């Protein structure tokens, strides 16, 4: 497809431990990027709608705990399944935004609580991840995007040791702010570079 993943890791996962991966979510290709950079076996918690996509859906179902967001029983069952995977030593990846926003001008949507509550319950680190280029390279808007580099940053882990569920909102906010600021700063760099290029011309 003409994509090359460029990975930068501030901290490297230990294959004897479990983690909760929390990347931003802007594109269908996010799932494939996550699979390409993961060092440990893991499962996604993912939405039912994506299973209907030809070819992609076939592989998606085999790497995901599927959630039907319109069904409260399904949501509860999903988190019970995630708990079992974590108890068995697997990592879990949850896109905490839940859905890709329809408005592509949104930098980062509000985070849901599930990933942070699960991480605290199991006392495992949050691994914030920034996907910089997936929206630009492979947007949900058809016939848009182009091949190129897909930059991924694994941020320093956020410990949940000693935290309780009362701390889940603060942990969620900390993770959100870290990824949001990273995306905004990257956008500022691109705007500055673009302006310099125009001046030189």
Give the positions of each predicted feature.
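Glycine-centered loop/turn motif at secondary-structure junctions
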Residues: 2-4, 64, 89, 123
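Structural signal for conserved beta-strand scaffold positions within catalytic alpha/beta enzyme cores
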Residues: 7, 44-46, 66-68, 128, ...
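Glycine-rich helix-loop-beta junction characteristic of Rossmann-like nucleotide cofactor-binding loops
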Residues: 9-14
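Short coil/turn linker and secondary-structure boundary residues
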Residues: 8, 69, 163-166
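Short gly/ser/thr-rich secondary-structure transition/capping motifs
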Residues: 1-8, 75-76, 134-137
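Catalytic core of membrane glycerolipid acyltransferases/transacylases, capturing the structured
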Residues: 1-2, 15-72
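Non-catalytic C-terminal accessory region of glycerolipid acyltransferases
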Residues: 77-201
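Generic preference for hydrophobic
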Residues: 7, 21, 44, 94, ...
